[in-house]
């Protein structure tokens, strides 16, 4: 009788579920193959490459100036931070000194970009979990910041403003005053968002103790940015390896304790507050002077010069068609982008085009840790974990 009972017990197989790529919580074109034991995740297998455009190869066929706009289109939520990394890499190869005013403007817009990114990351994450209102409120603030982008570069998203040697053009009249007014009222907007989320019972139930990453695991998987700091590691390239004028800025690095989704949320909120402090310091310390390097090999002549001098017109034409040559060398340069460490490994062979440009996208490394983060969690928690990773597929697939 016992033998008959044992033979009647059937082995239950795990259930395979395709999540995305047309899912609103997939944050782009993520195809996730989930192996489920009931509603518990046994394995998560991300399939990437659906947004691959061959960016790194395309850069090899462009001059150093023409390659710049590709960086706006990688992580299309934090545009200027990526331009910043590429420009620093080219300047390192050229041994080019950037004027002080240009450095302050770069830092100013890098922090504006950080707020832009975190507003989108936090509110889309909240929307995935079920809170719609913060998303609608945050986009009102994002619109103001995008207008600053538009006023300085003429473009709302793909600015191509931070360039090797400095910035494209000087700040327009009254822009600093408007940024100052924005900073004064933005802290209260963050408070309003925190009132809705931080101590909300449902929000905490969905985030606390979900997707825990220990400091050891964060290092092992190559995590950076908020995913590393949320695990209790105070690593921020703006502090540890300062670039431009970050060594003159006074700000704190927010660090978590548990390494869960809730800690990462708190880190992002505090980072926005710290970005306001940095922006205010940039506005107060902004010096007068040049905004482009005083090197005619790299810097194009001004419009007024071109209208008066034929040599300047020829110089401008050759600079944007042929470009400038960069000495035989290689460099790895990284910046603290909103999503983590964004790095550019640039190899020059002495011509006017890069021999190789390898991009270190933080989202690519974070996504490969999704299986580790979501194991033994419920299916609904996978959405929370993807939201807290802050993935954008422009940089993941490249």
From Swiss-Prot:
Cofactor comment: Binds 1 [4Fe-4S] cluster.
Cofactors named for this entry: [4Fe-4S] cluster
Gene3D superfamilies tied to this protein: Cytochrome-c3 Hydrogenase, chain B
GO cellular component, one term: mitochondrion
Organism superkingdom: Eukaryota
GO BP annotation list: mitochondrial electron transport, NADH to ubiquinone
Ion transport is among the record's keywords: no
Binding site for [4Fe-4S] cluster: 261, 267, 282
Gene name as annotated: NAD7
HAMAP family linked: NDH1_NuoD (MF_01358)
EC class of the enzyme, as a word: translocase
Task performed by this protein: Core subunit of the mitochondrial membrane respiratory chain NADH dehydrogenase (Complex I) that is believed to belong to the minimal assembly required for catalysis. Complex I functions in the transfer of electrons from NADH to the respiratory chain. The immediate electron acceptor for the enzyme is believed to be ubiquinone. Component of the iron-sulfur (IP) fragment of the enzyme.
Similarity-based family: Belongs to the complex I 49 kDa subunit family.
Quaternary assembly: Complex I is composed of about 45 different subunits. This is a component of the iron-sulfur (IP) fragment of the enzyme.
Protein name per Swiss-Prot or TrEMBL: NADH dehydrogenase [ubiquinone] iron-sulfur protein 2
Originating organism: Nephroselmis olivacea (Green alga)
EC number: 7.1.1.2
